[in-house]
């Protein structure tokens, strides 16, 4: 359900203690800030994608979605899970990737970039990497790890940054 609260929720919360932040994030109800965030996400996604010609928008989505998922998946190699395994919502805690899994993940992330019509659009891939780095640094400072919610938010924001970079490149060439 949707719930309005006078304070922020999760990572942006005014609380400083890791335990309190994680307790708030464990609540599966979406708050008013979550609703506002989703409205901004879908609005910005629509504005960015619709500002491109249809063929280019299709290429951006086909390349950007899997690339950003690959970038975001690296969160498990940079940060530990922030909760104890028995406290996880779905009782699943991911372990770091082996070298083989890491290489396979990188290959799978980069292969869809072949959909891009010109090599200059590869520069859009820098944006999600920078976004991922700053978000994971923030998570490390606030909760000393990641949660499933953090993974989802990292993907969505990385994806938006890819489309922003793509549109910037399109408008400058």
PLM-predicted stretches and their roles:
Residues 1-4, 23, 141:
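Short, flexible active-site loop motifs that bind/organize anionic cofactors or intermediates
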Residues 1-15:
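Single conserved hydrophobic/aromatic residue that forms the stacking wall/gate
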């Amino acid at each position: 359900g949707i719930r309005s609260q006078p304070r922020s929720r999760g990572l942006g919360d005014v609380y400083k203690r890791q335990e309190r932040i994680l307790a708030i994030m464990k609540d599966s109800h979406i708050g008013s800030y979550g609703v506002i965030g989703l409205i901004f996400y879908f609005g910005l996604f629509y504005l960015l994608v619709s500002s491109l010609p249809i063929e280019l928008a299709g290429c951006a989505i086909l390349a950007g979605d899997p690339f950003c998922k690959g970038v975001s998946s690296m969160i498990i190699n940079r940060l530990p899970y922030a909760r104890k395994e028995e406290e996880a919502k779905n009782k699943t805690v991911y372990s770091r990737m082996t070298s083989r899994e890491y290489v396979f993940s990188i290959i799978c992330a980069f292969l869809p970039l072949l959909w891009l019509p010109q090599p200059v659009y590869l520069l859009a891939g820098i944006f999600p990497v920078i976004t991922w780095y700053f978000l994971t640094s923030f998570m490390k400072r606030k909760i000393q790890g990641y949660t499933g919610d953090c993974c989802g938010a990292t993907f969505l924001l990385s994806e938006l940054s890819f489309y922003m970079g793509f549109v910037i490149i399109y408008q400058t060439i």
